[in-house]
Amino acid sequence: DYYDMLTGQEIKNRDFALMVMDSRGRVEDGNVDFINKKDQSFPFGISTDYDKLKEETKDYYAKSDLLMVNLGDTYRLDEYKVNLNSKTYSRMKYRVYNQISDYIEYVFKMAGKNDTIYILGSFPSKLDYANNRRLAPLVRFDMSDTGKGLLLSSTTRRVGVFANLDMGVDILSRFGLKNSEMVGRPLANKAMANRDDYMAKEYKKIVAISSIRMSIINIYVAVISISWILGALALWQRDKLPKKHKKNILNFLKEMVKLGLIMPLAFLSAPILRPGSQVQITLAIVFMTFLLYILGNRLFKNDDLKQVGFFSILMILLIVIDSVI
């Protein structure tokens, strides 16, 4: 719960309950309304009642196979941040996370060796979201496993990165259950000692790609649109083109159309160079574009149809390989 800062109206958010509802919207057991208390040292003067939460966690843990807990303090903190200076925000953030840390420690002491604990980090703040840092962290603790590493699924086929659709499937798989209507995949473990450094580098790449994606797509659409429109106009009015430059104009437009075929190939093949920043990604795409263009011209010199066929076959092969690996 929190208060709308424009209207002052209290907002009751119960979206989290959707995760444990049955097909008719019913929650078998739990507390979705009376778990907060008034505390002026917390955002909006509202705090999770952690003493009550601990008691109810212990009670529901004893009689339930699956227990989900949503802590609203982190969400309220992000919503309330605009009202705070940096010093006050830091103090309030410490207070919030100190309580959460104490609660998580309590849960770990209570958990048995056959339990699995999922800790889903809070959704990215508004600032992080604006800066394309849009992934929420998930940590899975298998209480019987002392190793450490990263999670992966066949949905993304990328170590440390998976879809939110996979979480529900993985929880069901812990009970030996399957739901035919779920499209996610169970999560697997990959042992890795340097997981933190690895994920920091991978996340940097993900943010870089997200930040530059729309610019690349816009450039691609512009190249395709301009080349096809100009090409169509040139063919339509070819008799009116200056005879001295007619051949050069048509050849240039023809190469522009081929460039439209090459650019998607460059997007797909650029990761081979392992770029890690926006500048490196841009340079990798430009390099692969020129490389593929020169390769096609050298292999099938003066044969445009074979060049188009070559680029098309390469595209099909890359898509097939990407879907298999």
Where do the model's predicted regions map?
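His/Asp/Glu-rich, glycine-adjacent segments
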Residues: 1-86, 222-275, 284-325
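Acidic, Ser/Thr-rich low-complexity intrinsically disordered segments
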Residues: 194-237
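Soluble extramembrane regions of membrane proteins in the secretory/endomembrane system
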Residues: 1-212
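Membrane-interface micro-motifs in multi-pass membrane enzymes
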Residues: 156-157, 161-162, 216-219, 277-287, ...
